[in-house]
Amino acid sequence: MAGHSQFKNIMHRKGRVDAVRSKVFSKLAREITVAAKLGTPDPSMNPRLRAAILAARAENMPKDNIERAIKKAVGGDGENYEEIRYEGYGPGGAALIVEAQTDNRNRTASDVRSAFTKSGGSLAETGAVAFMFDRVGVIAFAPDVADADTMLEAAIEAGADDVRSDTEGHEVICAQDAYGDVSKALEGRFGEPRRTGLIWKAQNTIDVDDETGEKLIRLVEVIEDQDDVQNVYVNFALSEALVEKMGA
């Protein structure tokens, strides 16, 4: 989780100007609509929709925006989005997985390929790097819901594989097929999590020097700036000095 979490921390520290925030809201709304279309518009019966709503709340997305995105799915309005996964390499041989939702596969493929190329990376064939990652569930809680030992005990008892606790909170990792049961057990005990969902977790992370790290950060930023891209997962770890520098 190191690389992915480090990069997200950098983006949060940088803050978001209105234009970027609008793009974030647009992507969150798209995920809410897609999740509601694929399942039920009731988040209590649709784990993916519930995760999307939690993500939207974490970004302070207005309640009206969330409700409109759900209604769009219920009313059958809007585009039908196809979910696509891209894989590629960045500077230093780092591996990246890109998740996108698109109504035009050719446009998105071209945009993602261009983003890789412009920033010193290369788009690869499907399956080229996925074997370096595991599909896992993640449930994150605020630090004050429990101490580290209590969270670890509860998570292991629920069937989780790992827990990382620090001053920022608790992050519980579990196998994809155990995600539903683990989520239900932990939420029943500790309440609503900060965020939850399925992610791609690197099996191992590679350390990169700061020069390469800056190039990789720029690559991820360019990819995430594409309208159709929802998530980017990486397998590199940055030095703490670079994290502080880029997040300042």
Curated annotation (Swiss-Prot):
One of its GO terms (molecular function) is DNA binding. SUPFAM superfamilies: YebC-like (SSF75625). This is Probable transcriptional regulatory protein Mchl_0946. It is found in: Cytoplasm. One of its GO terms (cellular component) is cytosol. InterPro entries: Integrase-like_N, TACO1_YebC-like_2nd/3rd_dom, TACO1_YebC_N, Transcrip_reg_TACO1-like, Transcrip_reg_TACO1-like_dom3, YebC-like. NCBIfam families: PRK00110.1 (NF001030), PRK12378.1 (NF009044), YebC/PmpR family DNA-binding transcriptional regulator (TIGR01033). It holds the Pfam family TACO1_YebC_N. Transmembrane segments: none annotated. Belongs to the TACO1 family. Coiled coil: none annotated. One of its GO terms (biological process) is regulation of DNA-templated transcription. Keywords: Cytoplasm, DNA-binding, Transcription, Transcription regulation.
